[in-house]
């Protein structure tokens, strides 16, 4: 039995950002695979964050690096945002300095391996009519050609907004979509609709207008986050066989938004319902002229900072003897053992779905050590388990098995196997207290581990909100855990 050394508790929790995300899975080329998005050819549930004011500041590198390390797949930006320098003129031409600024944003996003939703708008440009808007969007798409990591929203909530403050007509959307495809045939194109359009009508509009994705803004009622509500919307959106993108859910201070748990549950339910992507919508990215997005997020603990800082799941894995934890010796870079009696930084692992979003049973996952290394099945299985990998590839990919089909929750008993045929299972010798290897042929007691959600909120010096006294939702959130590896239903 080995007790944790006191010095280990002095280790700064590098888990909070650095190296916490599976790097190769979140790369540069965004495509469509059936009714899902794909990144570098691999289908992936995408998590975006609204950053409308990104054009307001000269250097976005710090913010985009932070968002990537926090676990986001992409950002949603508005080049014609009301507080920033506009991209377009009323005659349909583009402003050169704004083009340069947009390129800097997109170059930084590409460098940090972030996907970008470029959402255009016309109502912010006085005198811009629909024909000139077509000209402007087409010119902008020409400027976007070097970037494979983005999609284009022709107009935000086109059923409400458009040139001269009126909606952008369906025929205009169809014409602009055709012009975009003529300029860049591989560009992913959508045109978002508000809740004024039903999900069923939005799905049909996508087909009629020749769009690739159904981007939808949900109703901002009190039940917006619940499984039944999200499943109803996503099911209707997916009837056209194309990706359903929940592009703009509700935000604070609308009903049921004052705690991050609502957003964690909504994201989980979006993935479970089969959505292709979900966006964390916040007005804190609307105006960043005098600060950074990160500082604005940190200034509001609930819901923004709590959600953002806990997006990457952090867990301990307890062996089936109930007394030992998996440990990346030295915090990573060497051996993995199962001989520690108390969980600390070295026993705290990032638990990231390579398939995107919260971890569900059957997902392919990576396990990250506190120094940024990843767990590796040496030779792909049949031998040692180490924490020596600097990136995630085949040897660093494991599949989660448990006794249900839903999201992985605090207290779940899981097994982890290689994504090979035949598979190899991570095995704690003698069910704990000794070595760990990837040598199991089936999931038995030695291959079974209990998921314990790490107390990330306290580690980040964040106050944990008092969720008592709010009935069923209170119980659901406690079952969901603090990090979004959530409970069964949350209806």
Residue ranges of predicted features:
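Bacterial N-terminal signal peptides
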Residues: 11-20
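Lectin-like carbohydrate-binding module/patch detector with strong preference for beta-trefoil
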Residues: 310-462, 475-478, 491
């Amino acid at each position: 039995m080995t007790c944790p050394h006191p010095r280990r508790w002095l280790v700064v929790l590098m888990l909070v950002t650095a190296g916490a995300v599976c790097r190769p899975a979140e790369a540069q080329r965004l495509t469509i695979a059936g009714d899902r998005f794909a990144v570098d050819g691999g289908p992936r549930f995408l998590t975006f964050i609204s950053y409308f004011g990104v054009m307001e500041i000269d250097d976005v590198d710090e913010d985009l690096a932070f968002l990537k390390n926090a676990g986001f797949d992409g950002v949603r930006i508005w080049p014609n945002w009301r507080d920033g320098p506009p991209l377009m003129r009323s005659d349909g031409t583009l402003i050169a300095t704004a083009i340069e600024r947009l390129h800097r944003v997109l170059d930084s996003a590409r460098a940090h391996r972030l996907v970008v939703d470029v959402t255009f708008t016309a109502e912010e440009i006085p005198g811009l009519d629909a024909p000139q808007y077509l000209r402007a969007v087409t010119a902008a798409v020409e400027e976007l050609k070097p970037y494979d990591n983005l999609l284009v929203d022709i107009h935000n909530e086109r059923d409400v907004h458009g040139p001269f403050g009126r909606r952008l007509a369906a025929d205009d959307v169809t014409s602009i979509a055709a012009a975009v495809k003529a300029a860049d045939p591989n560009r992913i194109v959508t045109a978002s609709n508000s809740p004024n359009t039903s999900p069923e009508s939005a799905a049909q509009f996508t087909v009629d207008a020749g769009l690739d994705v159904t981007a939808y803004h949900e109703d901002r009622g009190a039940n917006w986050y619940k499984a039944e509500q999200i499943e109803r919307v996503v099911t209707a959106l997916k009837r056209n066989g194309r990706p359903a993108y929940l592009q703009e859910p509700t935000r604070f201070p609308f009903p049921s938004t004052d705690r991050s748990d609502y957003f964690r549950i909504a994201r989980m339910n979006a993935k479970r319902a089969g959505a292709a992507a979900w966006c964390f919508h916040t007005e804190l990215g609307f105006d960043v002229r005098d600060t950074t997005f990160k500082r604005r997020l940190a200034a509001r603990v609930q819901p923004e900072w709590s959600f953002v800082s806990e997006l990457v799941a952090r867990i301990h894995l307890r062996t089936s003897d109930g007394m030992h934890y998996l440990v990346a010796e030295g915090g990573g870079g060497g051996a993995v053992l199962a001989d520690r009696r108390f969980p600390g930084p070295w026993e705290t692992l990032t638990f990231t779905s390579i398939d995107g979003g919260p971890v569900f049973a059957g997902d392919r996952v990576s396990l990250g050590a506190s120094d940024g290394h990843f767990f590796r099945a040496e030779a792909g299985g049949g031998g040692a388990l180490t924490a020596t990998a600097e990136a995630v590839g085949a040897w660093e990919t494991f599949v989660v098995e448990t006794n249900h089909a839903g999201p992985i929750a605090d207290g779940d008993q899981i097994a982890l196997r290689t994504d090979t045929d035949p598979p190899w299972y991570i095995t704690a010798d003698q069910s704990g207290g000794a070595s760990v290897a990837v040598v199991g042929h089936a999931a038995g007691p030695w291959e079974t581990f209990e998921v314990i959600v790490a107390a990330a909120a306290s580690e980040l010096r964040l106050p944990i909100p008092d969720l008592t006294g709010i009935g069923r939702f209170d119980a659901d959130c406690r079952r969901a855990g603090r990090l979004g590896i959530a409970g069964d239903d949350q209806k």
